[in-house]
Amino acid sequence: MTLSDLKRGDVALIQCITNDVVRAQAIRFGISEGSEITVEEVLRAGPVIVQRGNMHYAIGRNLANEISVVYPLGDARNA
């Protein structure tokens, strides 16, 4: 599942960023493997807006498609 598959209000952990360019861009936002993010908004054919800590980031759809995520442990959707 990728970041662009999530819906508003979802909390997820960044699992993997395989593309080195995307990883470098995400690190600039303070987002890396293991980071917990909350989806604030998913704009149709536009960016995914996420919150990490007190910061909000608009991540373009192409970048969001390159970021693999999982739901946190204990989330029923992991079953």
What are these regions (language model features)?
Residues M1-A79:
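Compact, glycine-rich, soluble single-domain proteins
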